[in-house]
Amino acid sequence: MKYPLLALIKLYQWTISPLLGPVCKYYPSCSHYGYQAIDRHGAIKGTALTAWRILRCNPWSLGGVDHVPPRKRPRWHEMLRNAWRARKGGPSAAEPAIEGHIPSSPAAETPSHVQGA
């Protein structure tokens, strides 16, 4: 269902939108927002985000920059991953650091004179 909706938005952008001109108060425009929302979040949630955006785009709104929110993993996904790691004996994100050791990134372990300036 996602791809027919994306095709409808593209059809609107190529045919009707050029006739209306730039009337959206937001960046990106409502049609671009809708395309990104449906592409990123799927047909149901993307359509809901698009409808909410179109309702907010009215003569009384101030407009501005309004990007599509990033896709988040469901809460059960993290719980399942932690349970799987615990069963395999690996470290879990929920476990505290051992003996006060804070894991660092590889960049933090590299001496500063080695890194390019």
From Swiss-Prot:
The keyword tRNA-binding does not apply. It is a peripheral membrane protein. GO terms for cellular component: plasma membrane. Residues 87-117 are annotated as: Disordered. Keywords: Cell membrane, Membrane. The keyword Membrane applies. SMART domains: Haemolytic. InterPro entries: Membr_insert_effic_factor_YidD. Coiled coil: none annotated. Its main location: membrane. It is found in: Cell membrane. PANTHER family: MEMBRANE PROTEIN INSERTION EFFICIENCY FACTOR-RELATED (PTHR33383:SF1). HAMAP family: UPF0161_YidD. Belongs to the UPF0161 family. Could be involved in insertion of integral membrane proteins into the membrane. This is Putative membrane protein insertion efficiency factor.
